[in-house]
Amino acid sequence: MGQRVAEVQRKTKETDIKLILNIDGNGDYKISTGIGFFDHMLQLFSHHGKFDIDLEAKGDIYIDDHHTIEDVGIVLGQAFLKALSDKRGIKRYAHVILPMDEALIMVAVDISGRPYLAFDVDFKLPKLGDMTSQMVVEFFKAFVWSSKTTVHIKKLAGENDHHVCEAIFKAIGRTLKEACTIIDDRIPSSKGVL
């Protein structure tokens, strides 16, 4: 099995993004999006998933954070899809229930080739630091669509929006790491393709 690394670039009139992803990394990261809270969430994702991420994103954040966060989701999803190649040998399915103080988050993943997001999380505040709360779901929509992955994210408990969001990014990192784990040399589908 070769190294599962992907490099993706995306340049539009709104954003300029460069990403290198190593699925079989150590959780090393160099992340810069211009949105501090979002950087922190991606760092947690990298650390808890043990994905090496080198990400530089420049966007029109003088307008708002929408284009940058959504496009990072697109690029990260494309990188996972590219790095996993034909998905030979991966576990494919994984789930985790993760606490962060009073917050409790459930995440389940199927690296199926079929994009679907079930996002059952409410945030009380309009902003998380310098990040718009609504952009959490938009990030995951973009990631799921471009990675062709089914993801369920459900808040089981939680009062503090920061804790809830941290738990989500930690949980998705851990869940994807498990789903990407190599367990044999077969395509994990009765169809023979994902």
Curated annotation (Swiss-Prot):
Keywords: Amino-acid biosynthesis, Cytoplasm, Histidine biosynthesis, Lyase. Transmembrane segments: none annotated. GO terms for cellular component: cytoplasm. It catalyses: D-erythro-1-(imidazol-4-yl)glycerol 3-phosphate = 3-(imidazol-4-yl)-2-oxopropyl phosphate + H2O. Its main location: cytoplasm. GO terms for molecular function: imidazoleglycerol-phosphate dehydratase activity. The keyword Transferase does not apply. GO terms for biological process: L-histidine biosynthetic process. Its EC number is 4.2.1.19. Gene3D superfamilies: Imidazole glycerol phosphate dehydratase, domain 1. It comes from the Bacteria. It holds the Pfam family IGPD. It is found in: Cytoplasm. Pathway: Amino-acid biosynthesis; L-histidine biosynthesis; L-histidine from 5-phospho-alpha-D-ribose 1-diphosphate: step 6/9. PANTHER family: IMIDAZOLEGLYCEROL-PHOSPHATE DEHYDRATASE, IMIDAZOLEGLYCEROL-PHOSPHATE DEHYDRATASE HIS7. Belongs to the imidazoleglycerol-phosphate dehydratase family. This is Imidazoleglycerol-phosphate dehydratase. It comes from Caldicellulosiruptor bescii (strain ATCC BAA-1888 / DSM 6725 / KCTC 15123 / Z-1320). The lineage of its organism: Bacteria, Bacillati, Bacillota, Bacillota incertae sedis, Caldicellulosiruptorales.
